[in-house]
C-alpha cells in the first residue's frame, strides 16, 4: 500500500525535487515525515540518484531532516514516530546524495555525542560508510558506540538503533567495537547488562556461520563467556538474562553449523576450557547445551512446581560434565554454578532452598573432581544463600524440635566435600569458609548450623594461627545480638571445631587461651560439662606439641600446660615494674583468662591421675595458687603492697570462686572446688582485714576508687557465702570484721552529716560506707545466720531509718577541677570525670544503696508500719513509722534513678503500699502508674527489664494488695485489672511477661490455699479472668519467630550433650508455660473446699462464655488459626476442671455444653466436646433426657453437627455404667441410631452405623432380650454395611471410621489424663505441633508443684502409640505424591458431602445422559477435571463453559463450591444441567488411573519440554482434560500420569493464561473436532 501511494505521488509530480521540497515545507509532523520517508525510499529503490535528485536529497538532509531530528528532542507524543521516519529518510538521502554526505554527517554527529539527535544521525548514516575509504571514521564510530553503550546512562536509541546499525556497518567498525569491548577491563557487576546489550546487537557478526578471522570469533574469547555467565547467573533483570541465553544458544548453533573444532583458551592450564566444540562429539554436546538452556529457561518461571521436575536434568548435566575415563571435568564447572546462582537469586525462597538442597546433595550421588571454581562458589554464593534463616525451617510433618533437614544436609556435605579435598587445598578452603563467616553479620540460626557442620568435620591439621583468629572473629563479631541459647550452642560447636581442625604445632598455648577467652563461660564453657571434659582431654593429649609460648622458660618445659599456667599465675600476680601505679582498676579480662587456665590445667592433671593418686591433683592446684595465696596472706599486714597487685589478686580470687563450681545438673563441689575453696579460706582472715581497712580507713578517696569498693564488697560477699557453706561459727575470721565494718560505716555517715563543705574524699567515703551497709543488709537477707544477736543492731537500724531519704550528695567543689578519669575497656560505672553525668552516677549509687538498707529495715520491722496516722508508735524507726512520706519519697526517687537501680525501691513499695491501701488510695494508684510507666519503657532493655518486671509484679500483685483491693472494690482494684490487661497485651509482643505474672499469682494463691484461714483464698475468685486468660494464652507467631522457637527446642532436646543447656538457665518464657502454670495450679485446688469450688465454677462459666464469643466472632476461622487454638484451649481446660463440677452446677451449664456441640468446630474441638459430654453422662445420667433431645431438632439445622452426638452415642458402654436399669437407655439408643441410619447424608449414616454397631454389641453383651424383635433389622443393616458397600470407596470409609482412634482405642475414663488432653489428642486430631504440650514440660515446670496422683498425668491405654488417621486428617494426610499408595477421606467434621468420593457411577452417568437426551442436548465423552482449582470464580466459569459445549462430567475438589455465591454468579445455574463429581486432590491419582483403564486419554494443560501444540493436536473421543492449580499448575507427580501435554500457542510476553480461559479454549477445540466435524488432520 505504501509503495502504491509513493508511486502515485511521484507520478503526479514532474520533478522529484519539487515533490521533496513540497513535503519539507509546512509544519513538521509525524505524518509529513513518514510521507517523506516513503518517497525517498521509493526513489532509492528506483535507482535514481544522480544530478538534480542527488542535490535535492542533499538539501533535504541538510536543511530539513537534520534540524527535524534536533527539533524533536523536546518530546511530545509523536516524537518516536518523527525520529523513526526522519532517521530512515536520512539514510535514503545519504544513499541518494553520495558517500560525502554520510561522512560529513557522521563526523558532525561524533562531535555531538552523547546527545540523542547525534545517536539518531549515526544510526542513519553508519551503514552508508565505505570500508576502505572511511576506515578511520568507521573505527571511531565503533569505539564511540561501544563506549557510549557501556557508560550506563546512554540514550535508549543507542541500543535500539545505533548498535543494530553498527552491526550492518563495514568490518573496520565491527573490529573497533570488538576491540573496545575486549579492552574495557574486568566488568563490574553493573556492567554485565550493557556488555550483553552490545554483544546481542553484534551477535550476527561475532557469532556467524561464515568463516571469519579468529580474532572476531567471540567463541574463542574468555571475556565473552565470562560476561555470558555473569548474565545467566547474577543478572537481576530478565532481559539481560534473556540476552545471555540468546548468545549461548547462538554460539552453540553456529558451532554445530560450522562443524569445526574450536576451543576457548582455559583460564588455567589444569581446568577445561570455558567453551569448546568437537565435531566428533557433536550429538553429546548438543544434548548437553540443549538441556542446559532448557533449565535456564525453566528457571525464569520462578515456580517450584515447574522447576522441580527439571532438577533431574541438572543431575544429568553433572554426569555429562565429568569424564568417566579419567574423572576430570569435560565442561567448565562454572556453567553449573550459574544455574545455582540463578536459583539462589530467585525471589521465591522455596526455589532458593531447593537449589541449596540440590547442591548439597550432589556429593551423595557422585564424587565430583576437585575444582577451584567450585570451592570459590561454596565460600561465595553458597555461603550467601546459606545466610537466609528461612532455609532451615523443619519440613511439614516433622515434630516440633526436630533437626533442620537442610542443617543435616549441610553437615553431611561439608564432611564429604572436605574429605575429598586434596590436603594442600583443604586448609585454604576451610580458612576462607570461616573468614567468610566472620566477614558479615549472620543471623543466629545459620551460624548455629554452619558451626555444627564445621564441628562435624573429621579431625585434621587444617587451621593454624590465622584460622584460630578467624574463629575468634566469628565469636566476637557475628554473635553479639543473637539469642542466648543459640549463641551458647554455636560457641560450643565452634570450640569443637577448633579442637578438631587446629594444627597444635602451629599455635601456642597463649593462642589457645586467647581463643578460649572469647567464649562466654556463662553460656558455653562451664566447668563440669561434657564440653569441658572434652577440652581437658584434648589439652592432655596435645599439650606437648604446642608451639613454644612467649611465657615459657628455657628449660624445655615451655610447651607443658602446667609450666604455662604456673608462669601465667606468677606474671599475673606480681606487679610489673614498668607499669605505672594507677588510680584505676585493671581490666577483668586477665583475671578471667588466668582463672580459666588454672582450672583447666588442674582438671587436665586430674585426667592424667584418674587411676593414680588423687593427692597429686591437689598438689598441682597448690603449686598454681601459691603465688596468689602468698599475696593474699600478706594483704592484712603489708601496707605497702602495690595497689595494682592487690586488685589483681582479689579479681583472680573472685573469678576462681565463680568458675570452680561444676555446672552439671545437681552437681556438688568436687575435690578441686573443695580444695580451692579451702585454700582461699586459709587466707580469709588476711583478706577480710584488708577489706575492712580499705573500706573504713579513708583510703578510698577518688571517684575511680568506687570501682574498687565494689570489688572489695564482692570479695567480702564471696567469703561470707563460702563461710556459711562451710559452717558459720562464732568468732570466725569473717564474722570478726562485720561488726567493726558496720560501726565504722555508721560513724562515717554521722560525721558526714556535720560537715559544711564536704571534700571529694569525704564524699567518696560516704558513698563507700553506704555501699558497705547495703551489702551487709543484702547478705543478712540472704543468710539469716549472719543476723547479729547483739544489742548493737537496734541503734544501727535506728540510724539508717533516720537518714534523710533521697538526700542528694553535694558535689565537691574544691577538688572538682583537679579530678578526672579516663575511660576503661571494661566499661566501669564510675569511669567519667566529675561532670554532671559522672557525679550523677555516684549519686544514683548512693541513693540505690540507701534504699537497699531501707528495704531491709522495712521487711525486718514490717509489723511496726502503721496503717493510719493514729496507729503511729513512739519513734523507734522514723521511716517505718511514716509510711506516707516514705512512699512519696519512693515515687520521687523513681524519677531520678536509672533503670538498673530501682529494684530496692520496688521492694520498699511492696511493703508500704499494703499498709496504705485503705487510707491513701490515690497515692497507691499513683505508685502503680509510675511503676508501670517505668516498666513499659524498659521493654527493649534486656538486662534490666526482667529483674525489674519481676519486682514490679511482686509489688503490684502482692497477695495482701490483691486481697484488700478485691474487698474494697475501689479504684485500686480497677487499676490492678487495667495493669493486668496491659501486661497480657505486652506479652503478645514480648514473650515471658505473662509467665512472670501468672507464676507469681498462682504461687501466692497456693500459699493462701494451704493456709489456715478459710477466707485467704476467696479473693482469687475476683481475679479469675487472669487464670482464664492464662488457660487460653498463646499467640500465632510469625514464621521467623517460629523458626527461632523450633531451633531452641531442638537445642534443648540435645540435653546435656550441648553444654549450653547445662549452663544457661531456662527462663521458661515460652507461651505454653503460661498454660502449664495455670493448669497445674487448677489441678492442685480442692473441689471440696468452698472457696476453691466457687473459683473453679466461676472460671468454668467464663470459659464457656469465651468459647461462645469466639464462635460468634467474625474472625476467619480455619484450622490452627488463633480462634481455633483459643477454642481448643477452652475445652482442654474444661476437661481439667470437670472433676470439681457437681450436679447442681452442671444444671446451669449443660445447655451451653450441648449448644457447643451444634457449632461448626474443627475436629480437635469436637473430640473435646464429645469427651466432656460422655464424662457428664457417665457421672450424672440424670442429663440423658437433655442428650436425647439433641436428636430431635430439624435435620437441616443439625445435619452438619449430629455426628458429634452420634460419636457420643458410640461410647454408650461408658455412659450406662452407673445406670442400674439400662434397658430403656439401650432401647432409646437403638431407636436413635436406626433413625439416623436413614439420613440422606453419607457422613451421618456412617456415624449412625458406628453408634448402632456399638449399641447392638452392648445389647448382646448384656443379653437385652426385649430388643429381640429388632434383631433382623439391625443385623441386616450391619451386614449390609460390611458387605454391600463394595462399590467405590464406601467400604473403605466404613472400615476407616471403625478403625479411627476415637471409636477403636480411645477410652473416655482410662485416657482421662493430662497427657491425652494436652498432647495425644491434639496430635491425633491435626492440631499444629506448637499446641502439643508433652508431659515432660509439666514435670520440668517446678515453680508449681505437681499433683500427688501420678495417674492423673499418664494415660492408661495405647492411645499415645497411634498415628493420626485418615478420617480426621484428610487435609494433612498423604500428599499428592503418595496418593497412589494411600488414598484420603473427607473430614466429616467439616461439613463436606462425601458421596462424590467414589468414582463416577454408571447409573449417575445414565441419569444425566437421559436428562440431556430429553432436552435435545448433544453429549460428548469429554471429562474435565478441575479438582486442583481453588477459586470459585474459575470453577463457576468452567461449569458454564462445560455445560454450553456439552462436556460429559465436570470433576471438582469439593461439591461445597456449588453453594458459593461467586460460583453461582458465574455458572448461572449451569450446575443443574451438568454432572458434577467430587474427587479430592489427594484422590486424583487413583481417579486418573481408573479412567485410563477405561480407555480415556489423560490430557494436561501445561507448558513442558515435550508439549504438543493445540493447533496441531487431534483429540481422541474419550478425552480427560486435567487443569492445573491457579498458582502451582499441575503437580509434578500428576504430570507423570499424563498421556500428553497440550500447550496453547502464544505470541505475547506473558507466559500463562487464566486457567478458565485455557480450559475453555481446549474444550472448544475438542467440541470443534469431535462434535462439529471440523477436525483437520495434523500437518
UniProtKB/Swiss-Prot annotation:
Pfam families (UniProt xref): SpoU_methylase (PF00588), TARBP1 (PF25050)
Biological processes, Gene Ontology terms: tRNA methylation
Gene3D superfamilies: 3.40.1280.10
N-acetylmethionine PTM positions: 1
UniProt keyword tRNA-binding, yes or no: no
Reaction equations catalysed: guanosine(18) in tRNA + S-adenosyl-L-methionine = 2'-O-methylguanosine(18) in tRNA + S-adenosyl-L-homocysteine + H(+)
Coiled-coil intervals, chain numbering: none
InterPro entries: Alpha/beta_knot_MTases, ARM-type_fold, Prob_MeTrfase_TARBP1, SpoU_MeTrfase, TARBP1_dom, Trm3/TARBP1, Trm3/TARBP1_C, tRNA_m1G_MTases_N
GO molecular function terms attached to this record: RNA binding; tRNA (guanine(18)-2'-O)-methyltransferase activity
Residues annotated for S-adenosyl-L-homocysteine binding in this entry: 1501, 1524, 1544, 1546, 1553
E.C. number(s) listed in UniProt: 2.1.1.34
PANTHER family on file: METHYLTRANSFERASE TARBP1-RELATED, RNA METHYLTRANSFERASE
Record family assignment: Belongs to the class IV-like SAM-binding methyltransferase superfamily. RNA methyltransferase TrmH family.
Quaternary data: Monomer and homodimer.
Name used for this protein in its record: tRNA (guanosine(18)-2'-O)-methyltransferase TARBP1
Species of origin: Mus musculus (Mouse)
Taxonomic classification: Eukaryota, Metazoa, Chordata, Craniata, Vertebrata
Gene: Tarbp1
